[in-house]
A protein has these predicted regions:
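N-terminal export signals
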Residues: 1-11
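Histidine-/acidic-rich catalytic cores in large beta-rich domains
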Residues: 12-313
Length: 313
């Protein structure tokens, strides 16, 4: 296992970003930052906003939300070559927030719009070529959705933050499957360090199961299609290789590596807790990255850049 670099070691290594292990693009402190596996800052773009999704495209550009309702594709020389601004569509007349997007191989972009309660596919010219109306019983322009991810069968898994549940939709907007988050034994509490059912992320795994980044449910867990939990990482279950307790707060991005390891983000846990953690299926912590002056404890979106093989994210 790799040695972990805890907070006490940060003072002497502040010039870049500490204990990177992987190259990555991260949104934190209102900046998009690309670092190499040594932690050297390769590129930084200041936008004053923290995105809930991020994508490093094959052409080297970065796709990111730079305002609550704006997605931009940014080149390495910081030119914006494509953008989308969400606008209210009747009957909705309030704000729009974009928490999830994906660039398709055909050049189109999948976008989820909270407020409009829809998933849209937009071509490079900005024309909507397909739209899926989401079923949202408790509309909230900030919380209708978090991450939305396509499956290999062409359906969409949607994390409905405000309702604390996952729904799977087909292209006709039919709900095929649903899973509701539970509080468990812990009562609901407010705040960044609180506990609830505000789901953030959802991924379709190769075995057909669904992996959930619970947001303030403070855990990662895998469910089968009957809704049974078959694997989980609970809030205070993990320890670093040197025995220090890891306390999960807002569990956000998930990257499942080819070898089955999981790299995930946990936000708002404070300066003494990791922001990125890699675990294997035995729940052994292989690596953890702590906040530093470049990347803080507010990470909701990261993208590993130098990983061999396919990554589910």
């Amino acid at each position: 296992s790799a040695a972990l670099l805890g907070p006490a070691a940060l003072a002497s290594t502040m010039q870049t970003s500490t204990n990177a292990r992987y190259g990555m693009v991260v949104q934190s402190k209102g900046k998009v930052t690309r670092i190499d596996k040594a932690g050297n800052i390769l590129w930084q773009y200041e936008c004053g906003y923290n995105s809930h999704d991020i994508r490093m495209l094959p052409n080297g550009n970065v796709l990111v939300t730079t305002q609550p309702s704006v997605i931009e594709e940014i080149t390495p020389d910081k030119k914006v070559v494509w953008s989308w601004k969400g606008k209210a569509v009747a009957p909705h007349d309030g704000p729009i927030e974009i928490h999830s997007f994906e660039r398709l191989d055909n050049g189109n972009t999948i976008i989820s719009e909270s407020g409009n309660k829809r998933i849209i596919e937009v071509d490079p010219k900005g024309t909507i070529v397909h739209s899926i109306a989401l079923t949202v019983e408790k509309p909230d322009w900030h919380r209708d959705t978090r991450r939305v991810r396509r499956t290999d069968t062409g359906t969409f898994l949607v994390a409905h933050e405000g309702m604390g549940l996952v729904r799977e939709y087909d292209k006709t907007a039919k709900v095929l499957w649903e899973h509701k988050l539970e509080l468990g034994a812990e009562a609901a509490t407010p705040g960044a360090n609180g506990h609830g059912v505000s789901i953030f992320n959802v991924l379709s795994l190769k075995n057909g199961n669904v992996l959930i980044g619970g947001g303030n449910n403070n855990r990662v867990y895998e469910v089968d299609r009957s809704g049974k939990t078959v694997w989980s990482i609970e809030r205070d279950e993990l320890k670093t290789v040197d025995g220090k307790a890891i306390h999960l707060c807002w569990v956000t991005s998930l990257n499942v590596l080819r070898n089955g390891n999981l790299v995930f983000a946990t936000a708002f846990a404070g300066p003494d807790q990791p922001i990125l953690v890699e675990v294997n299926r035995k729940k052994e912590v292989l690596w953890a990255k702590y906040p530093d002056t470049t990347i803080g404890d507010d990470v909701c979106a990261f993208w590993l850049t130098d990983i061999k093989g396919s990554v589910i994210r």
